[in-house]
Curated annotation (Swiss-Prot):
HAMAP family: NDH1_NuoD
Locations listed in the record: Cell inner membrane
Membrane topology, from the record: Peripheral membrane protein
Keywords assigned by UniProt, alphabetized: Cell inner membrane, Cell membrane, Membrane, NAD, Quinone, Translocase, Transport, Ubiquinone
Family named by the database record: Belongs to the complex I 49 kDa subunit family.
Gene Ontology molecular function terms on file: NAD binding; NADH:ubiquinone reductase (non-electrogenic) activity; quinone binding
Chief site of localization: membrane
This protein's name: NADH-quinone oxidoreductase subunit D 1
Keyword set includes Membrane: yes
Top EC class of this enzyme: translocase
Enzyme Commission number(s) of this protein: 7.1.1.-
């Protein structure tokens, strides 16, 4: 009788693993140190968001979007606001568009800073997260000064934004950009040439362009494989078509390329922010920040103190809400994690009939098995980090 030394393991990665980015549970089948199969178990953070939205008015649905990708909340609201605006035919004034773009780019930097620095932490570098969180703290303060909340803003409303930015805040955001670019250079210097960081990321989790399209990837995941696909450029929304920025693309499609793209995107976001700040202090210094269509946007508070009609109007908008013409629309934005889309079906009432949320992280997570096969166990956390997954949007 011959004896065989079998080294097949089934292990659980998560749900409380420090590298699992939330409540992810992966069931791994290993042959020694080599991963043979990865089975993601999702649903641990499922809150029934899409069903809850069907019972709320269009205005009451906005806070649900903050809680999807809670790392960059305003980018999610943006997609929903665009969908409602397309159904109602609402135009957003230029100052409102610039504020939206400014805060969308702040969200992109928030997300990329968290991802790049925690990616470094997953492979064992402790300094970058400390630097990254210092910058994220300043950005959270900008969120707070715009709308009063650090995380769940409910600031992008259909028709524009909730309130105008103070002049001083716009100036402070402008002053923040240069020191931030210095921090990005510091993180760059620490990681990009670092031998250990390279060994942990180069040629790990390689995706060819055909595979990226086939798996339904978007955002950094397809750009890392060599496609210059960015919704801000290919299907421009708001005022992105008037702004100058470059789209970085990779050629190897591995974790390291995706890291490099996120680093460049932070610099490009800062460049977009500078253009927005210049215009908000220049030609768009004064002006409305939300649509003047009184059927969607509530009257100003001062007006309500003077006019009975405004008070009635405000009461109607916040109790019954506005009725959206029947129809369906798909609105997508280039969120930090990829293409975040909202498919909104209206039946002509004050509540959505159906609101399907297309989360980029969901499509990326399903490819975990394909990406990790044949890699070492330690590479699973590197691949997971480069996918940039947040569980709020995967489980919704």
């Amino acid at each position: 009788m011959t004896e065989h030394n079998v080294r097949n393991f089934n292990i659980n990665f998560g749900p409380q693993h420090p590298a699992a980015h939330g409540v992810l549970r992966l069931v791994l089948e290993l042959d020694g140190e080599i991963v043979e199969r990865v089975d993601p178990h999702i649903g641990l953070l499922h809150r029934g968001t899409e069903k809850l939205i069907e019972a709320k008015t269009y205005l009451q649905a906005i806070p649900y979007f903050d809680r999807l990708d809670y790392v960059a909340p305003m980018n999610q609201e943006h997609a929903f606001a665009l969908a409602v605006e397309r159904l109602t035919g609402t135009q957003v004034p230029i100052r409102g568009q610039l504020i939206r773009v400014l805060y969308s780019e702040i969200g992109r930097i928030l997300s990329h800073l968290l991802n790049v620095t925690t990616q470094a932490m997953d492979v064992g570098a402790l300094t970058p997260p400390l630097w990254g969180f210092e910058e994220r703290e300043k950005l959270m303060v900008f969120y707070e000064r715009a709308c009063g909340a650090r995380m769940h803003a409910a600031y992008f409303r259909p028709g524009g934004v909730h309130q105008d930015l103070p002049h001083q805040l716009v100036e402070d955001i402008g002053k923040w950009i240069d020191p931030f670019l210095k921090t990005v250079d510091d993180i760059d210097e620490l990681l990009t040439g670092n031998r250990i960081f390279k060994q942990r990321n180069v040629d790990i989790g390689v995706v060819s362009l055909e595979d990226a399209w086939a798996w339904g990837f978007s955002g950094v995941m397809v750009r890392g494989s060599g496609a210059a696909w960015d919704l801000r450029r290919s299907q421009p929304y708001e005022c992105y078509s008037d702004l100058e920025f470059d789209i970085p693309i990779g050629k190897n499609g591995d974790c390291f390329d995706r890291y490099l793209i996120r680093m460049i995107e932070m610099r490009e976001s800062a460049r977009i922010m500078r253009q927005c700040v210049d215009r908000l202090l220049g030609d768009a210094k004064v002006g409305p920040v939300s649509s003047l269509d009184g059927k969607i946007v509530p009257p100003k508070r001062g007006e309500m103190k003077r006019s009975m009609e405004a008070l009635i109007h405000h009461f109607k908008l916040y109790t019954e809400g506005y009725h959206v013409p029947a129809g369906d629309v798909y609105a997508a934005v280039e969120a930090p994690k990829g293409e975040f889309g909202v498919y909104l079906v209206s039946d002509g009432t004050n509540k959505p009939y159906r609101c399907k949320i297309r989360a980029p992280g969901y499509a990326h997570l399903q490819a975990m098995d394909f990406l990790c096969r044949g890699h070492q166990l330690a590479d699973v956390s590197a691949v997971l980090g480069s996918l940039d997954i947040v569980f709020g949007e995967v489980d919704r």
